[in-house]
């Protein structure tokens, strides 16, 4: 079984949320949208988890960082 999967189904390819919905500009003030791409600990989720394209992952990262600087999103969640 060189390189084969053990049982189960083949993984479904993730589709970029932004290209599928026709979103070209990611606004740092749209906190509800940005929260979908941040973990419960406050960390930015990677592409392999969210399925976003490289272009939109870069835009998303900049929007989240700008939103954090403007205190719209927390840097970390308190425990």
Swiss-Prot record:
GO terms for biological process: translation. One of its GO terms (molecular function) is small ribosomal subunit rRNA binding. One of its GO terms (cellular component) is cytosolic small ribosomal subunit. Keywords: Ribonucleoprotein, Ribosomal protein, RNA-binding, rRNA-binding. Pfam families: Ribosomal_S18. Coiled coil: none annotated. The keyword RNA-binding applies. Belongs to the bacterial ribosomal protein bS18 family. Part of the 30S ribosomal subunit. Forms a tight heterodimer with protein bS6. This is Small ribosomal subunit protein bS18. The gene is rpsR.
